[in-house]
Amino acid sequence: MSKVQSITRESWILSTFPEWGSWLNEEIEQEQVAPGTFAMWWLGCTGIWLKSEGGTNVCVDFWCGTGKQSHGNPLMKTGHQMQRMAGVKKLQPNLRTTPFVLDPFAIRQIDAVLATHDHNDHIDVNVAAAVMQNCADDVPFIGPQTCVDLWVGWGVPKERCIVVKPGDVVKVKDIEIHALDAFDRTALITLPADQKAAGVLPEGMDVRAVNYLFKTPGGNLYHSGDSHYSNYYAKHGNEHQIDVALGSYGENPRGITDKMTSADILRMAESLNTKVVIPFHHDIWSNFQADPQEIRVLWEMKKDRLKYGFKPFIWQVGGKFTWPLDKDNFEYHYPRGFDDCFTIEPDLPFKSFL
């Protein structure tokens, strides 16, 4: 059988997916976090891998799914939160635009799995399966009640799950995880298809979503999940020291308010008294495409007049950010390589070839 005859769609997928293979898994495992710092990697959407100076590994909102893949059904699912929000009928054209940079089934060293809320792009059955199958049998799954309900429904033992609500603190080795109030109004209208939201007092946010503050020996990270802007960010900023804050950013389609705008991101950062603000979530959905440079431009316009005490940082999926080493950087660039150029003699026809 010739080579072209032996290749199938399945063999093509297995040979190319996930696109980064285990490259990032290996990078994270090999990273030695220096004292007085913490390192984190962007996994796409709001997925974050955090590693402390003590070698503690936690992942938050790591999602390995995809968006729309076919024009087959032109209508939105009945009762979808966006349908409730805007009274739409047409299919939402939300295609995943970000590659898969971390292989969940190559994860071996992990100390906790967390989710901020139960939306499909923030909690993942594949991650749960991979951790259950390949990692230590005491790795906890931490999240609000709706997330724990999902994990247990997928087969994660109830005793492995920790339900958190605002005010709760969970210690995972040298990382202290504080569950804080979330402000994700979209989560409140994510309901069963046959349940009406109109005229009904919504279920409390605390069972559906939380924000997290990760206090590490080397600094503190605030993860806002899918939260919208809220004045309550200022309360969180008053009560906690926050070094780096992550906020869900995107260009909201007409009739929709689901992501923070550039102005919201700056207000969030100012309210939290953070030193660095990093937008995320704008990478993942084609119909919420947004340019994070807008945040930096607006920051430049306002920073002197409003005496901002923070800087924005524009990240790339799969990239690493180390606090405080990267606190004065504005943008991430993937490693460019070739730092060892001319360590051996080039093999060229003549010196002026290049």
Curated annotation (Swiss-Prot):
Known cofactor(s): a divalent metal cation
The protein's predominant localisation is: cytoplasm
- Its gene is ulaG
Keywords associated with the record = Cytoplasm, Hydrolase
**Pfam families the record matches:** Lactamase_B_2
Q: What does this protein do?
A: Probably catalyzes the hydrolysis of L-ascorbate-6-P into 3-keto-L-gulonate-6-P. Is essential for L-ascorbate utilization under anaerobic conditions.
Q: What is its EC number?
A: 3.1.1.-
* The protein's name: Probable L-ascorbate-6-phosphate lactonase UlaG
Write out the pathway annotation from the protein's UniProt entry: Cofactor degradation; L-ascorbate degradation; D-xylulose 5-phosphate from L-ascorbate: step 1/4
Which signals induce this protein?
Induced by L-ascorbate. Repressed by UlaR.
Catalysed transformations (reactions): L-ascorbate 6-phosphate + H2O = 3-dehydro-L-gulonate 6-phosphate
The record's Gene Ontology cellular component field reads: cytoplasm
Q: Which Gene3D superfamilies match?
A: Ribonuclease Z/Hydroxyacylglutathione hydrolase-like
Single biological process term from Gene Ontology: L-ascorbic acid catabolic process
Cell compartment(s), UniProt: Cytoplasm
**What GO MF annotations does this protein's record show?**
L-ascorbate 6-phosphate lactonase activity; manganese ion binding
Please state what class of enzyme this protein is: hydrolase
Q: Return the similarity comment.
A: Belongs to the UlaG family.
